[in-house]
Amino acid sequence: RYKPLAAPGGISPMSRTSWSWRNGLNKPEIVMEGGNVADHPVLQTTTTPDLSLISTSADLAESLEPFYATSAATALAARMAAKIKTVNPDLSLLSVRGMMVHSARWTEEMKRIGSINDIMSICGYGIPDEKIALFSNERYATYIFENELIPYVRKDGSNTYNQLHFNDLPW
């Protein structure tokens, strides 16, 4: 008998993070379901189909097969990005990415990790909400401005304001 290693709402034990980097970079920006690992008294930790996602198989004898980890999470993120781009064809891919990040939230389990810096380096901004990302143009005030600016610069050993853009809103 085995039990899932990660708690519901937690990150997959197979997740790659920037936690050990300690340089302020956040990896990943979002987290998607990548399956879980089973804790077994004899096998120790192992993957199992019961805790994995499923997809169609190339093996005709087995129509479905489990897949997990980065392969599963990346496929789900790509699916969500494609759906956002389909609903909002005028958005750039950078804006699609921004919509995914903007819709993300931490679960209660993720919030138990500790400091905000630790959560950001392990979970990024959290799990994106597909409905918010897909329909935020219609139901929420979402302002997308694509341009380049450098808001802060380092001068004399401290951060200083640099650039700021003001935009007139249409209401």
Where are these regions (language model features)?
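Divalent metal-coordination and catalytic microenvironments
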Residues: 30, 80, 100
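An often Trp-containing, charged/polar helix-loop segment at the C-terminal end
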Residues: 88-112
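Catalytic-core environment of secreted peptidases
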Residues: 2-75
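Long, internal scaffold/assembly segments composed of regular secondary structure
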Residues: 62-63, 96-99, 116
